[in-house]
Amino acid sequence: MTGTILRFYVHENRTHRHVALFEWLLEQAKKLGIHGGSAFRAIAGFGRHGILHEEHFFELTADTAIEVEFVVTDEEAEKLLSLLRQERVSIFYARVPAEFGIVEGDL
């Protein structure tokens, strides 16, 4: 099957409608019928402003990046991007063509 890997990059402390943005993204994708998504926390990184963000042991609020990733059909990708535009969410994303499937085997 062919489709899209859709990745969003957000700061961990960013919210939308009083919910962490990465959690809101996962919930909205689920409501759209997308079959799965994952959120990954970065150890360290920098963005377009060149500021290094990294997690420290004693921080109460982290400012590191969260990557939210979906492997979807092109139609599902468009639905999710359209929703973000309607909600006026400003967010960086990467859209990569993908081939995906399931390898069946003995369990």
Regions found by a protein language model. Give the residues of each.
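Positively charged, small/polar-rich N-terminal and surface patches that mediate targeting and assembly
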Residues: M1-L107
